[in-house]
Amino acid sequence: MRIIAGEWRGRPIQAPSGQGTRPTSDRTRETLFSMLVSRIGSFEGLRVADLYAGSGALGLEALSRGAAHVTFVENDPRALAAIRSNIAALKAADRTEVRPSSAATLSPTQPFDMVFADPPYAQGSGDAVVAAVGQAGWLAAGGWLAIETEAKEPVEPGDWTVDAERRVGRARLTLIRA
């Protein structure tokens, strides 16, 4: 795995060991960021959250492209170690926060401009993300929620709007606008 574009383009990303995570492939990440850039233009100055962060690849990609700050939420110890290792390798500690907790039970915080979520593939996981993000107030008005689910699983946007969906291999990428 590697960073696709921006300040750290081509830099490797360490993936967590074991079967507990399913890292987003370079191809899927490239498709997702292409979809986002065509809509938002730039990540400059954005506050970003990376839920079910795994290796932190989505949040690190956003940082590489100019995001001001990324909060990583993950509860798997091996994934947390990989995230911290990747942050250290990129010398990005001053622009990040790592929250060792479950993304399924988010505590209220200042809203983010962009929220990435890559929950485990399971029936209803995308809908659960929409509900948790909405209840905790994690998405700013006009912000974006990007969710990766299994290809056969559509995501209901709740009070928000689905802006785009795309299938990439076994994955479905859903962009939701607040």
Regions found by a protein language model. Give the residues of each.
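Class I S-adenosyl-L-methionine-dependent methyltransferase catalytic core
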Residues: 1-178
